[in-house]
């Protein structure tokens, strides 16, 4: 008669398989290519909850890794064995050895198993302050996953063989609350049978005509249309507004971008109106903002620029990828704009070889923002999303914001940047940019495995340092960037004089003797770079005057364009709030202890009752 209370209490213990947790998971993604491993997640204050649904009757593994490999990873393993759920917190050391974590920070909420699938739901704190756990921030996380047909035993989980993988995600991207109709009209801007050359990098440009609208419409969602099997080939897509002074003859055929023989019409396409990069999904504008079409100020012709990345020089590739734009006649309050901020893509952007860390900065200067905003919108513009962009050497990007010498909260950041995963970050709160503010796109690179200089450029082996700001209301400012002074960079390696007038590119060194008649690129590569020299060079570059780029639509420029400016004096750097360690571990232990104590008391009560009979 005393056994039934124990069974009831067992159903109350954490990890019971009695039923679902009742939680909702607004974010969901497939981790494998066969539809076997689904991940759902949801942030709740200082905690994050996960739901794993996997086609297996054995254990399920999940975790976070600094590189996507098993070394130095934060791992949790769970399942249902003999009708009883389990969940264990593990970690791996630098040698990929799996060890049980002394501080168990993952807490089982629900587990279920049937003949084909296992479902596990669990929570953890964003910041556990356990050295073996990965803190979860707004940055990219490299999720690792695995499963096995057998459950984990007392000795730990068996090796998962090929049932494993990795995927980069941003777990704390704010939820998109607006629900869009599935019947929205759309049009496609998609390349037709583009032959991809057998070289590592190709930029392909094709002009399109926007459908003719008799009245104003708003684009409210943009999705990538990537040809199946080309997910790693198509690295990023930019959509530019072109001059409206054309006829349809410009639509006849595409051409390789930035090529001497490309059509002159392409040169009028300077205003970025949308950007997508590898790993990103569709983008929905906020409920009060849309991309305007149908008015005289809106694009009639656009240029689709697709960056193809073919590092294996594969031959015979034909691509049909592009963008799909969903639109509505239900006009929203504001028109969206895009500002490209950061380092102007140029050979003057230099990164020495062999550097475990090197920092570059691109300045959207107060002079440019002062002139453009005072003329267009003195009350300021409101940023609601940011795309951070770099290439293979990129390790971290931050978009910093300054006002009158004071550093504001970061507009956007990704301290674990992944070249293969770049998407717009929705800001948790819209941020206002005022006349006279400064923006700095700060990029961190690693060139330890490179023997020669890395230059700013279009190739994925070259580098970029850019931020694309989505904002409203739209103003006539499309690019706010900078170029560092090259002569002072060359003086660092001992260059004294170049041949003038400059008639070749890259230009040629005249003196000293060791660099005579070398291009400035060859001279920089000839210099004997050490880590110490690289650090000194980095300090110099960050202090150099910059050439201002401040562009309007239709290749027009603000008057500040081409002038020289100094990096801002930062009187009051931003102090981020310290991370607060979660308490779920202690509260869970207290809860478990209380329930176990109650179980013991009931057992004792049953025993005494039996003896008294």
Curated annotation (Swiss-Prot):
Entry keyword set: Copper, Disulfide bond, Endoplasmic reticulum, Glycoprotein, Membrane, Metal-binding, Monooxygenase, Oxidoreductase, Signal, Transmembrane, Transmembrane helix
Main location: endoplasmic reticulum
Residues at which Cu cation B binds: 389, 391, 464
GO cellular component terms, semicolon-separated: endoplasmic reticulum membrane; extracellular space; secretory granule membrane
Record's comment on post-translational modification: N-glycosylated.
Record GO terms (molecular function): copper ion binding; dopamine beta-monooxygenase activity
PROSITE patterns per record: DOMON
CDD domains xref list: DOMON_DOH
UniProt-annotated location(s): Endoplasmic reticulum membrane
Top-level lineage group: Eukaryota
Spans within the Lumenal topological domain: 20-592
Known cofactor(s): Cu(2+)
UniProt family annotation: Belongs to the copper type II ascorbate-dependent monooxygenase family.
Protein's name in the database: DBH-like monooxygenase protein 1
Organism of origin: Homo sapiens (Human)
Designated gene of the protein: MOXD1
